[in-house]
Regions:
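Residues within well-ordered alpha helices
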Residues: 29-31, 49, 98, 102
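Feature captures the FAD/FMN-dependent oxidoreductase FAD-binding
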Residues: 81-132
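Catalytic P-loop NTPase motifs of RecA-like helicase/translocase cores
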Residues: 24, 46-47
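Short, glycine/charged-enriched secondary-structure capping and boundary segments
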Residues: 30, 52-55, 124
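N-terminal Rossmann-like FAD-binding beta1-loop-alpha1 element of flavoenzymes
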Residues: 10-39
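A short, basic/flexible loop-to-alpha-helix module at the beginning of a structural domain
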Residues: 1-12
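Glycine-rich active-site loop/strand segments that organize a redox cofactor
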Residues: 44, 51-97
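Short catalytic/ligand-binding loop motif for oxyanion handling, primarily in non-cytosolic enzymes
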Residues: 47-48, 118
Length: 132
């Protein structure tokens, strides 16, 4: 994924911190509601814990189907888990597949840490500060 320029004053309806499985779903859901969304992810890719934890033998301890999103019947039909308890690379591959299928990367800033979030009561607005 290409490097993005730093942002200064940008407005979004919602900001999601993290592009793990919860962050990807939240981005998909908020966009489906017609909201403008930005996701900030500290890692260089999506997948959350499955991006960060790449040690030998890493795999899920719940059935792989528990990681499957149910918001798209087409997605459910086209993805088949190879094992009941999938290894880390397969789970990460699934997260990337979902991000690509639903064009989620367009709204995700990778390698970007949120340093602080400040709520301005007078403006009724959050201000998000990142390391970029």
């Amino acid at each position: 994924m290409e490097s993005r320029p730093p942002e200064t004053e940008c407005e979004f309806d919602a900001v999601v911190i993290g592009a793990g499985f919860g962050g990807l779903y939240m981005l998909h859901r908020l966009r489906s509601l017609g909201l403008s969304v930005r996701v900030y992810e500290a890692g260089g890719g999506v997948g959350g814990t499955w991006y960060w934890n790449r040690y030998p033998g890493a795999r899920c301890d719940v059935e792989s189907m528990q990681y499957s999103y149910s918001f798209s019947e087409e997605l459910e039909q086209e993805w088949e888990w190879s094992e009941k308890y999938s290894p880390q690379p397969e789970i990460l591959k699934y997260a990337n597949h979902v991000a690509e299928k639903f064009n989620l990367h367009d709204n995700i800033y990778l390698s970007t840490r949120v340093e602080r979030a400040v709520f301005d009561e007078n403006k009724n607005r959050w201000f998000i500060h990142t390391d970029r």
